[in-house]
């Protein structure tokens, strides 16, 4: 069972609405269903807690583990409280009955095992005696065949009985104790099917310490699954990893590759038809015959100029790749994939100190994605999602897709401002971050969040370390061609990003969706 209940937080905040989930005998609560991917804020085991109905307030109930946990809850109505009481009571009763039955079976099996072990010791002693008797007969050289057959028959019978009893002991032990060792937690423990930013790494043989990139796997059920691989190591994926990539579409800078089993779309390194990467395509004439990755004749780089790939040129999806639809419609899926692709920039700045910023950005992406997957045919563009919520009068409701997109575009403006500072030649990363923050997010943050950001600035990397993190191949940042490559890639990336953010700004201004709320 799941639903909203009011939980007593403290004397300052009082009763606050929380989303509760009862699953597997455990009651967990979250800020909202959309925030469930962050993990529960608290939980209580129904089998060991007491359910108390308030004597005065007919909408209130208390869940108590004496001396440990106290959940003071209120329903929105008497009928709703009754439904929760029935569900909680049933869960507690089922778990209690199950535990009682298991304890009873465990006690019986323990007793049976003790009995069998006593029999085993008896047969063991008997075996020792019969072996000694057999030795005596053999040593004495007794020729009475009848006595010899009698001793041998007894020994064989005792051995068979000993082995049979030992087997019974093992069967009892397996039935009684193995399951207890396997299940330290109840088998029905809740496995919450919520949206998570799940990440997995494929077993690719490492070449060097290179930049990590992410590929997005769209799931109809729970959003997007991000698979992290190393950019330069994509060339080994066909032979070294479980993803078999097939080249299907080639243009000047990217190729689209599709895994037929998992519908994984990869845009990045250009591959030959035989599946091998043309590693020298960056060092040779782009129009060299025999290569499948042929750039157009209008290539702005000269034949002898080394073209070094960067983080932005090897993105699996980029804002510069997005083609706007009719009436400047921004395609939802491509936009969200591009947002995911730029998130690793925050890891280059500091995976720990910038974790809250990254979490907020990813959380807003997921909220929009959750809305999108409810009706992919209708919500093909971001504008359609916003207009749908405007018409339903839920655009400014907390945790709506419109609100999530509002904060998402603010976060993207911050990243764009920072990258613009770097492109314009700012060598101090702290200064670049501070300037970008002051122009974008600072006006929407209260003094607490501003203080957190100020602390994060102190841990910002040096310009050299940040640039090194944007390389695909270790040591490329020391080459002169890398700076030109960064300028080239950002000159394509940032204007495309700015254009789409400007479209969203216009949309929000027209419908009065901008908010002055400070967090």
From Swiss-Prot:
Region called Disordered, residue ranges: 275-302
PROSITE patterns (UniProt xref): PH_DOMAIN
Q: Does the keyword Phosphoprotein apply?
A: yes
SMART domains per record: PH (SM00233)
InterPro entries per record: GLTP_sf, Glycolipid_transfer_prot_dom, PH-like_dom_sf, PH_domain
Q: Sorted alphabetically, which keywords does the UniProt record give?
A: Golgi apparatus, Lipid transport, Lipid-binding, Membrane, Phosphoprotein, Transport
Region (Glycolipid transfer protein homology domain) residue ranges read 330-473
Mark the residues carrying the PTM Phosphoserine: 145
Q: Which gene encodes it?
A: Plekha8
Record-annotated PH domain positions: 1-93
Highest taxon of the lineage: Eukaryota
Q: CDD domains attached here?
A: PH_FAPP1_FAPP2
What's the entry's take on its domains? Answer: The PH domain of FAPPS binds the small GTPase ARF1 and phosphatidylinositol-4-phosphate (PtdIns4P) with high selectivity, and is required for recruitment of FAPPs to the trans-Golgi network (TGN).
Asked if Transport is a keyword of the record, the answer is yes
Q: How does it assemble?
A: Homodimer. Interacts with ARF1; the interaction together with phosphatidylinositol 4-phosphate binding is required for FAPP2 GlcCer transfer ability.
Q: Which GO terms describe its cellular component?
A: membrane; nucleoplasm; trans-Golgi network
Q: Which GO terms describe its biological process?
A: ER to Golgi ceramide transport; lipid transport
Q: GO terms for molecular function, please?
A: ceramide binding; glycolipid binding; glycolipid transfer activity; phosphatidylinositol-4-phosphate binding
Q: Localized where?
A: Golgi apparatus, trans-Golgi network membrane; Membrane
Q: What is this protein called?
A: Pleckstrin homology domain-containing family A member 8
Its chief place of residence is: Golgi
């Amino acid at each position: 069972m799941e639903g909203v209940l009011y939980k007593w937080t403290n004397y300052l905040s009082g009763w606050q609405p929380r989303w509760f989930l009862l699953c597997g005998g455990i009651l967990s609560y979250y800020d909202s269903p959309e925030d469930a991917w962050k993990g529960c804020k608290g939980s209580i085991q129904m089998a060991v807690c007491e359910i108390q109905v308030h004597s005065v307030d007919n909408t209130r109930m208390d869940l108590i583990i004496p001396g440990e946990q106290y959940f003071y809850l209120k329903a929105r109505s008497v009928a709703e409280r009754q439904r929760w009481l029935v569900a909680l009571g049933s869960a507690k009763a089922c778990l209690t009955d199950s535990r009682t039955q298991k304890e009873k079976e465990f006690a019986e099996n323990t007793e049976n095992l003790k009995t069998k072990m006593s029999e085993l010791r008896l047969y063991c002693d008997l075996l020792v005696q019969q072996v000694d008797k057999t030795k005596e007969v053999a040593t004495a050289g007794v020729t009475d065949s009848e006595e010899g057959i009698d001793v041998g028959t007894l020994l064989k019978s005792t051995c068979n009985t000993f082995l049979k009893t030992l087997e019974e002991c093992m069967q009892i032990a397996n039935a009684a104790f193995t399951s207890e060792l396997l299940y330290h937690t109840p088998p029905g423990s809740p496995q919450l099917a919520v949206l998570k930013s799940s990440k997995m790494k494929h077993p690719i043989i490492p070449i060097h310490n290179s930049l990590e990139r992410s590929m997005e796997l769209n799931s109809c059920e729970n959003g997007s699954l991000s698979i992290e691989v190393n950019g330069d190591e994509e060339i080994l994926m066909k032979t070294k990893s479980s993803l078999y990539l097939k080249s299907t579409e080639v243009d000047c800078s990217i190729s689209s590759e599709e895994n037929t089993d998992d519908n994984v779309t990869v845009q990045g390194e250009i591959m030959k038809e035989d599946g091998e990467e043309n590693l020298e395509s960056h060092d040779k004439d782009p129009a060299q015959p025999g290569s499948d990755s042929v750039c157009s004749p209008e290539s702005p780089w000269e034949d002898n100029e080394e073209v070094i790939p960067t983080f932005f040129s090897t993105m699996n999806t980029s804002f510069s790749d997005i083609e706007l639809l009719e009436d400047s419609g921004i395609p939802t899926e491509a936009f969200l994939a591009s947002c995911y692709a730029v998130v690793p920039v925050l890891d280059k700045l500091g995976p720990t100190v910038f974790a809250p910023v990254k979490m907020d950005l990813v959380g807003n992406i997921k909220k929009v994605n959750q809305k999108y997957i409810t009706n992919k045919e209708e919500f093909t563009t971001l504008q359609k999602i916003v207009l749908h919520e405007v018409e339903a009068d839920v655009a400014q409701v907390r945790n709506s897709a419109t609100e999530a997109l509002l904060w998402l575009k603010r976060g993207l403006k911050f990243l764009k401002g920072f990258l613009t500072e770097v492109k314009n030649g700012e060598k101090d990363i702290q200064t670049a971050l501070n300037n970008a923050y002051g122009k974008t997010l600072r006006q929407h943050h209260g003094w607490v969040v501003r203080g957190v950001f100020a602390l994060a600035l102190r841990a910002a990397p040096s310009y050299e370390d940040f640039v090194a993190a944007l390389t695909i191949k270790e040591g490329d940042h020391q080459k002169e061609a890398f700076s030109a490559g960064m300028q080239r890639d950002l000159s394509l990336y940032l204007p495309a990003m700015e254009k789409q953010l400007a479209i969203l700004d216009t949309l929000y201004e027209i419908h009065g969706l901008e908010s002055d709320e400070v967090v």
